[in-house]
Amino acid sequence: MKILNFGSCNIDYVYQLEHIVTDGETEQSVQMDIFPGGKGLNQSVAAARAGAPVYHAAVIGTDGGFLAEILKSNGADVSLIKTANVKNGHAVIQVNSQGENAIIVYPGTNHLIDKTYVDAVLSHFESGDLIMLQNEISEIKYIINRAHSRGMRVVLNPSPISENLENLKLSEISYLIMNELEAKRLLGGESAEQCLELAKEKIPETAVVITLGKRGAVYQSGDKKVYQSAFKAQAVDTTAAGDTFAGYFAAGLCRNEPIESILKTASAASAIAVSRHGAAPSIPTLTEVKEAMPEMTERPGNAEDAERLKKIADYVSGNLKEATLGGLSAELNYSYYAAGNLVRRLTGMSFTEYAQQRRLEAALHMLLSSSMPISEISAAVGYETTAFSGENLRKNIM
């Protein structure tokens, strides 16, 4: 079994700053680095470092030759990559002192993929092979359809979310891997649990993985649901967290490992990646992950905790304007003190911080899915003024 990754290859220009720049602001960077990147390249590096046989297909520009060398040096087959006489795709990445990031992407050569090239690449693969995809290249819909027709298992990470995903035939996708915000945009739910319920109704044959940051990840396939706690890590750069998880997840599928093992290894690899700077350079090898795992600590979490977290999320989402810790303690039938400790244990935040994050998530959902003016959105989520800014959204929604 082989993995084909039809994915982006970018040049990442990474700027280290005290805080992420907002509208009208000029901030001096304390450090600037150039890294190989692109979600496609990162995920190929992750899958290859996880020991899987990976073939990367992409179009790179005149300034992107080193990207193919990076892939090759990490064990990926690059014989299917094309070169075009134009500038390569690139990303400008701001990373603040807490390791959080904001990213601007220029697609460049990533949008030069056409149907003829797709057909030529897919001719090298057969039924049962895996194909990994992200939303940074052209012809996504065509690639999914043709790969599905060949009997390949399609693994889609629908990131970054954009309008071109709205008409995808999700039933042709074998595995969807996305974060909570992406799940809400793609499936329409207001929480991870609600998104999973909607997925079961809309795409019952598709396995869904939702990554939840510090809360871990959840996998659903039919009636089977598996929760994986996050591993504790000192985050310095979260850029490659999702890509590391996706690449390791695909590698585990390629080896037909149990889903519980796949989730645990992918989560550990992701935790190691966020403790390092850069995108592709931060991704650990399988040997590193296996050696580190015995010493790594999982954040507390299980099915019961997932249900408790759902109750907390449902309470806050249903009471955005009036949610209080006292109200939550009454809802859970916990003491005020116990409710506060539970929120902190499950989310890594105080109740006030968690409620603010849920309000910001709700605000962003309204901004992206409606034409409501900001003043109305602000009032709807519980702010007396238009207090949520672009900086707050980027800082709090990961």
Regions found by a protein language model. Name each.
Residues 1-23:
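Positively charged, low-complexity intrinsically disordered leader regions
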Residues 163, 193-300:
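Conserved phosphate-binding/catalytic region of the ribokinase-like
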Residues 291-314, 318, 326-332, 345-353, ...:
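Short, Lys/Arg-enriched, Trp-marked, Pro/Gly-tolerant hinge/linker segments that flank
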Residues 3, 23-90, 292:
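Substrate-binding N-lobe of the ribokinase-like
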Residues 1-6, 69-83, 96-226, 288:
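Ribokinase/PfkB-type carbohydrate-kinase core domain
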Residues 339, 343, 388-389, 393:
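Short hydrophobic/aromatic patch on the recognition helix
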Residues 313-314, 318, 322, 345-384:
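Terminal helix-turn-helix DNA-binding modules in bacterial transcription factors
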